[in-house]
């Protein structure tokens, strides 16, 4: 399918990337923790999701945020499903206390130099 790559924003033929792969791939699918990436961002480029630990970490952070907001999970509930926490305590506090001025739906967080992800 053609569409906009989640990472680079280019209009390309897209591939589905499971944010949490391996043994956690089925649960990643169950909770909609997938993104559509162009082949470069998915597997070809040195900075792609499958070749760069930094890119994988960025997507893990996005996936945890998405799961915690959509499922209304605590950090502990996320860890029970996915085995690890990827967010810092301030981000977790904001998710777990949505009525305290944190806008989970439209907040943009600077994750890396110049990279904005919608979560």
Describe each PLM feature range:
Residues 1, 110-119:
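Short intrinsically disordered terminal tails
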Residues 1-15, 40:
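Short cysteine-rich loop/turn motifs with clustered Cys
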Residues 11, 22, 42-44:
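Short, charged/polar surface micro-motifs in flexible loops or helix N-caps
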Residues 12-16, 45-48:
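Cys/His-rich zinc-coordinating "finger/knuckle" motifs
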Residues 13-26:
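Short recognition patches in nucleic-acid-associated and regulatory proteins
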Residues 25-35, 43-109:
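Polybasic, low-complexity binding patches
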Residues 36-37, 115:
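Aromatic-residue detector
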